[in-house]
Amino acid sequence: GSLVSQAQHEYTIKGEVKGVKDGTHVSLFLTDGRVGSIVGTDTIRNGTFFFKRNAGESGMDQLSLMCRDTDFPPMSLDIYATPGAKIKVTGTNPLIYTWRVDSPVKEQQEHNRFIEDSRDLWDEFQRLAIKERSMRSASETERKALRTKSDSISSIINQRELKLMKELPISNVWMEKLLRLSMSLKYNPKFTNKEEILALYDRLNEEQKASIEGQEIRVNLFPPKTVKEGDDMADADLFDLDGKVHHLADFKGKYMLLDFWSSGCGPCIMALPEMKEI
């Protein structure tokens, strides 16, 4: 019985790609929130690669396919997988972000709509990313010119996505897009469509606003006031490993080490044993 249930949870990813060097390594990452972990590697032989996995407990794995080769952009292909799905990946060049994913998974089909909407621009964006990677030793002026070009392309893609999002119902993929747009608003000076993004954010119900993505979007759209030297430190409900709540105000007058880190930060995780000793 267990073999049958295992087979029912299994999905396959079959790749057929042209214009890619034989012997190129491909890695499959499983994304959990902001953290990605490698769950498989394969080598492209005669233009093919293959992965087989059991879906996680949530019933939907969010994956990304990546090649670290210098012919490739430092980007990855987004894949959504569910139990029993037979997924086919095809490409004609190393522009991996726009390789085609033929899949029965609803989230994948929705994601594909966004890609197709800006395929020409994404291809150009990837070519620039490859060029920028090979220009590490170039002058700052040349690199800045490339970045300005990338920012302009990115801004047009964002505007196209905004237009598409107005027509689509809210879903997980839609929320991911809104999060990406809110980050662009924060970091890309060429992207200035704040009113339109706020209008999309206003479509969210309370539960969606309270989700992890919803909270991140809110912080990007309404940046919190930063604390200056000499001000009272910003405070919040901080939970220890036993789930007990603490506040920074409880430690007033004492020395304190605050370690800020990103959820998927490798060096931070490696430093944990030392932090515990302190």
Regions found by a protein language model. Name each.
Residues 252-277:
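Conserved redox-active cysteine motifs that mediate thiol-disulfide chemistry
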Residues 147-149, 185-194:
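Short coil/turn connectors between adjacent alpha-helices in alpha-solenoid helical repeat scaffolds
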Residues 215-248:
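N-terminal "domain-start" segment that seeds a small globular fold
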